[in-house]
A protein has these predicted regions:
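Short, small-residue-biased leader/transition segments that mark boundaries at the very start
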Residues: 1-2, 119
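Extended, charged alpha/beta regions that create polyanion-binding interfaces
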Residues: 6-11, 15-22, 88-100
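Solvent-exposed alpha-helices and their adjacent loops that cap or buttress functional pockets
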Residues: 8, 51-57, 64, 93-94
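An N-cap/entry alpha-helix motif that binds or orients negatively charged groups
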Residues: 12-53
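Gly-rich Lys/Arg/Thr-decorated short loops/hinges at beta-loop-alpha junctions or inter-strand turns
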Residues: 24-25, 65-75, 92-102
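Short, glycine/charged-enriched hinge/interface segments at domain edges or termini
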Residues: 38, 45-60, 73, 86, ...
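An N-terminal-biased, well-structured beta-alpha scaffold segment characteristic
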Residues: 46-53, 94, 98-117
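Glycine- and acidic-residue-enriched helix-capping/strand-helix junction motifs
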Residues: 71-85
Length: 120
């Protein structure tokens, strides 16, 4: 069955990729992570409005589900929701070039979902 074989072949539909297509040498690695990234964090702390200037947050969404209503199949749970959330993330990237991260929650009551203030 083509539906299952594609999912099994690729072990999911999405991945993250580096924007820097060049070789990541020691100097770049030190800049992208530690210690160089500290300067970027300090710049954002000084001016939070600069967050999109330095990070992917200007082109990022979360695709979130608890698996309680999967494509008309009903409540199949969060694990069964993951391929659907990946598919939605794929659509965001393919049609709008928006990076999307699938997130499934193992809670079903709104009161169980404790979301703090968004920082992005």
């Amino acid at each position: 069955m083509l539906f299952r074989s594609l999912h099994q072949k690729y072990k999911g539909k999405i991945t993250t990729a580096l924007r820097d297509n060049g070789e990541i040498d020691r100097d770049k690695l030190s800049s992208y992570y530690s210690p160089g990234v500290g300067a970027v964090s300090q710049a954002i702390a000084e001016n939070p409005a600069d967050l999109p200037k330095y990070t992917w947050t200007n082109n990022l969404v979360g695709v979130i589900s608890d698996g309680s209503a999967i494509l008309g199949l009903g409540n199949l749970g969060p694990k069964a929701a993951m391929p659907v959330m990946e598919g939605k993330a794929l659509l965001f990237k393919h049609f709008a070039n928006v990076d999307a991260v699938p997130i499934v929650l193992d809670v079903h009551e709104p009161k169980e979902i404790k979301i703090g203030r968004a920082h992005v």
